[in-house]
Amino acid sequence: MKQLNYLLFLLVCLVTSIPSFAQFTINGRSVIYDKVSDTYMVSIPENAFGTDYEASIALDATAGWSNLSIEGTDIADNYTFKQVEGNKIYKIHAQEGDKEINTQLTFTFLPLLVMEGTFGYDYAQGNISLLSPEAAEPTNSFAKVKWRGGSTNTADKHKRNYKIKTLNEKGKKQEISLLGMREDNNWILDAGQIDLFRLRNRIATEIWNDFATKPYYASKEPKAKSGVTGKVVEVILNNEYRGIYSLTEAMDRKELKLKKYDDKNQEFHGQLWKVSSWDKATFWVLS
């Protein structure tokens, strides 16, 4: 049975393999396509915004594009994007055999998290790729992903939260570091459904992390944290732009440095309690 499950996982990996993104690259960075707006996106360092951004442009030899031009300028190997700004659009033209390609490009200084797969209430196989503005090469991983949440995970929600578990090529858990956060295989994508600015939850948590008192056992576990670290990212799911999310660590035993129950000596070394519903008991505790 294990062998059969492994073969099925390999088959899924072949179908949903780590994507090769680009028809072209900009300063070695992959561009990501959003089919909803017919726009390519690329993540570059924030200090490039408000400046003329000089970039080397390279076509992917396997993509079939030729005769690339940007804003009417034929591209040999480089181009200067004038006064880069958020949401500023640059017109792109190219040939793909006999087909004319007319599309557009825009820049962001937020990391781009690309997910591929068909996800729902239960875990399903897929993959993720994280493109940081500070790194030319993406971080790639197989993953299993599902929708996350209670009241935020109902049929009327237009923007889903996600739970991501990173896997290796054998379908086993694989701990990786994303955007400088802890190495783990357990990640949360928070949609900020009632946070119209998509930033308040993240900023509030960062403020908490700045002034929160260390756990009482900090002398024994100096790396214990009482708040999670997270980063703001833009998410593209199956070539469709899904908006701004907060990619965070999980608040768990690992974050709090809690030791498991000692069966031998029958000792508790710490417990983590989580609210599962907003019932009367919960409100009584919080009042």
Predicted segment positions?
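Bacterial Sec-dependent N-terminal signal peptides
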Residues: M1-Q23
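Phosphate-handling architecture centered on phosphoinositide signaling
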Residues: T25-I57, A63-W65, G72-S287
